[in-house]
Amino acid sequence: MAKTLYEKLFDAHVVYEAENETPLLYIDRHLVHEVTSPQAFDGLRAHGRPVRQPGKTFATMDHNVSTQTKDINACGEMARIQMQELIKNCKEFGVELYDLNHPYQGIVHVMGPEQGVTLPGMTIVCGDSHTATHGAFGALAFGIGTSEVEHVLATQTLKQGRAKTMKIEVQGKAAPGITAKDIVLAIIGKTGSAGGTGHVVEFCGEAIRDLSMEGRMTLCNMAIEMGAKAGLVAPDETTFNYVKGRLHAPKGKDFDDAVAYWKTLQTDEGATFDTVVTLRAEEISPQVTWGTNPGQVISVNDNIPDPASFADPVERASAEKALAYMGLKPGIPLTEVAIDKVFIGSCTNSRIEDLRAAAEIAKGRKVAPGVQALVVPGSGPVKAQAEAEGLDKIFIEAGFEWRLPGCSMCLAMNNDRLNPGERCASTSNRNFEGRQGRGGRTHLVSPAMAAAAAVTGHFADIRNIK
């Protein structure tokens, strides 16, 4: 029977399945951070259980670390306790930890791929909703809750029901300057923020194949923002070239054997999906969210929509509420909306290609008066590479703040946050009310678009910036 990529990955990991029971899956990789793991380790300790496979468990600190100092005390008592607990737990249970002083420390979904922890064909879990990022490699990756974190630590397995399948095909070639972030925001604009609920999404089409691995990670990272369980891109030569030579990747003949298997991880001809969505890449322009969920998104050259234009009463009410929170009036051009802060970072857009794109706009320009702009690399290696390329100097000379790695202003768990009423052009993944700080107003954009907003003081079309 013809199978989708998701069905192949799921079936390959079933340990046990009985009639009327949820299947038990084997988990190949478990990524751990300081926020969702303390209670899980406490549960192991209370029952006298070890970590079943410490060699398949990798930990880092990211959510509430300071981006200004490596001092564990910098972000308050709760953050300090969580980080100290992670140090203690990893030492006690034999788990590898990339702590604040480790050169590989960084956002968990940046660290995993760049160290070769993430590989095609794997099941990967983490107590974090954006674990879908790793699906870019053709891995089945999804976020889990703290009780499930404990279950995986104890058994290296997890009970999971089968999801529905969705194919999202982006046909044709994207125009110059259109990034993976624009593509995924356009997709969510079409599906809505709940359009993928109950599904695992496979992204395909020429525009997806054209993306680098970093672009594919941005794409899969935001699958969760359309309600999907996970996002997938089938592995190809782009994937294999990225993985080759990385720290935890197979070497020599083992790598060749792995690639032979990875090449089978494609949706079979004739396989059927429960839902199919199609977009034309050439129709996608730079995207900016205007509301309080990622599906409330328009082209940078559009006007703020009028709630009355929505036929669905639920959408209309949501738009009215969003505009009131965002302090926006219907009909005004998006390019006239001024911003207070810019955040370039997060597990969505903090990799080297993202920083290069932002630096290209920042080079030779200055951050607009009254705007605070932060650039937060996703990991120690990203920061080191950016500095080797001189990107930090470009940003600093333009008036951006060059920070240490961490999740930062994406979710405001450290000291990087918006004040009430402040408006931010952000490369992160969520624009919910209060996400970047109580009363803060978040607009999601690509790194180049964020840099353009920083130097102009308002939203601007990067295609017009020469």
UniProtKB/Swiss-Prot annotation:
Record's catalysed reaction(s): (2R,3S)-3-isopropylmalate = (2S)-2-isopropylmalate
InterPro entries (alphabetical): 3-IsopropMal_deHydase_lsu (IPR004430), Acnase/IPM_dHydase_lsu_aba_1/3 (IPR015931), Acoase/IPM_deHydtase_lsu_aba (IPR001030), Aconitase_4Fe-4S_BS (IPR018136), Aconitase_4Fe-4S_dom (IPR036008), IPM_dehydratase_rel_enz (IPR050067), IPMI_cat (IPR033941)
Cofactor(s) needed: [4Fe-4S] cluster
Biological-process GO terms, alphabetical: L-leucine biosynthetic process
Enzyme Commission number(s) of this protein: 4.2.1.33
Gene (name only): leuC
Phylogenetic classification of the source organism: Bacteria, Pseudomonadati, Pseudomonadota, Gammaproteobacteria, Enterobacterales
Entries under Pfam families matching the protein: Aconitase
The family this protein is said to belong to: Belongs to the aconitase/IPM isomerase family. LeuC type 1 subfamily.
Sequence intervals crossing the membrane: none
Pathway participation: Amino-acid biosynthesis; L-leucine biosynthesis; L-leucine from 3-methyl-2-oxobutanoate: step 2/4
UniProt: [4Fe-4S] cluster binding residues: 347, 407, 410
SUPFAM superfamilies the UniProt entry points to: Aconitase iron-sulfur domain (SSF53732)
Enzyme class: lyase
Summary of the function given for this chain in its UniProt record: Catalyzes the isomerization between 2-isopropylmalate and 3-isopropylmalate, via the formation of 2-isopropylmaleate.
Annotated keywords: 4Fe-4S, Amino-acid biosynthesis, Branched-chain amino acid biosynthesis, Iron, Iron-sulfur, Leucine biosynthesis, Lyase, Metal-binding
MF-aspect GO terms: 3-isopropylmalate dehydratase activity; 4 iron, 4 sulfur cluster binding; metal ion binding
Coiled-coil regions listed: none
Subunit structure of this chain's protein: Heterodimer of LeuC and LeuD.
Protein name as catalogued: 3-isopropylmalate dehydratase large subunit
